[in-house]
Amino acid sequence: MYNYNNSYLHGFRGNIETSQVNNVTNNKTESNDQENKTVTQQQELQQVTPDFNVKVPVGYTKTGVEKLSNGQEIHCYKLNNGQKVMIAPKESAMTTLNTYVNTGSMNEKDDERGISHFCEHMAFNGTKGSDGYEKLGIGDVFRKVGDMGGRTNASTNFAETNYTISIPQFNKNDFETIVKMQSSMMNNLEMSDNMVDKEHGPVTSEINMYSDMPDNIAANVAIKNLYNIQTTSDDVVAGTVDNIMNVDSKKVIDYYKNNYYPANMTTVVTGDVNPDEAIEIIAKNFRGENPSKTDRRMEALKPIDKTVRKDIISNKAVATTGVICFNGPENNNTKDNIAIELVNEYLFNRLNSKINQSLDE
């Protein structure tokens, strides 16, 4: 966009005045010719049409550099719209872009249980291509990432939804390409009635698949009992077939407005990238705006204070499945979480773990 100030015209008039002083014999006709040229110059400038589609990058602040025990540096930023960004540069064959949305099944109404997972599916069904975001059709993300030799996926959990793209960077512009795609998925989805109706089938099929998995059944029963979650859904994350069939475009749009906004997202980059260059690309593309107000639901978790045992008999099981759950430390308690991981590894996750040894005996 051009800035039409008076400095250029003032300089032009100055040239006319100098010419008039040096040529006092010039007649009125010559003076009028100069004035006409001035008018012509001004008219030509006014015909320039500014490009209103140019998008200004979101500003950002570098909040620090964290250093892990292995020497890995993590460059931390916060965009002016509240979105957090963490960049971990390292030599790697793959560069991975993850965006975590701070929402999951614990943010759903019970009669809409499963809508977080449904919205995860919708993210791959195309974007509108408005407001300067990239236009994507159904399956375009999978196709384009596949053409680059990469992979893409997403997952929904109790408290977060994660979108990931991982590629080998053969070309310099590949990183910006995947950032543009993911930012469009987060901010510019096509959520028409037709698109929502088409996704009912795949999502309900997935629910039916999970209902036949003994380990999934056991895990859901354990979680619901551990935190006294009152729900009509057998699967806390996937929801029920009835819930999903009742999801329409209005419910999807409302859920997005209340949960998918910059201040509720964190983007993490790992791989062979320059942090200074990467943050500029991210700030230019993740330029979403926060709603003036939100109506977020938070599940009231009430951990049990005594041991609960549930036995499930299923004709779908081919072996015995056991699940043990307990209320662990908060997410930001790094020390205790590391200790819990070590205990889990010792007890469960090795071939020669204590549990396996006991079962063998």
State the predicted function of each range.
Residues 45-56, 78, 134-294, 320-322, ...:
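Charge-rich, well-structured scaffold segments of protease-associated domains
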Residues 78-81, 87-89, 101, 154-156, ...:
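Pocket-edge structural micro-motifs
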